[in-house]
Amino acid sequence: MINGGENMLRFIEYPKCSTCRKAKAELERLGLEFEAVDIVNETPSKEEILTWIENSDLSLKSFFNTSGFKYRELGLKDKLSGLSIEEAADLLAADGMLIKRPILEKDGKILQIGYRTEYATLDL
């Protein structure tokens, strides 16, 4: 793991999350250089989140940690379909724990959200 510039993979994580730790270990095992970003201490900005949403074909729901306490506390299951992209980005930028993780990102484009598919299959 290193801090890098352009064309660098960014691994956005919650370090206490076991899934994030497993995904990070795979990146290290693959020998890939990446910048690790703590989603709580360095929550992505609204602008960054909007870029992700606009540059992906993922559903808005894909960006939310639907199993998290904050998601349930805010009742987002019933509200999400009525939110605009701007409103969703505001919510996500306000609390990193609402964001699905880990996120593997490069040049403002999401390569993968979550860790259901091993990174080795992504042709990184």
Model segments located where?
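Thiol/selenol-based redox catalytic cores and closely related redox-interacting motifs
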Residues: 41-124
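Local sequence-structure signature of Cys/Sec-based thiol-disulfide redox active-site neighborhoods
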Residues: 5-30, 34-39
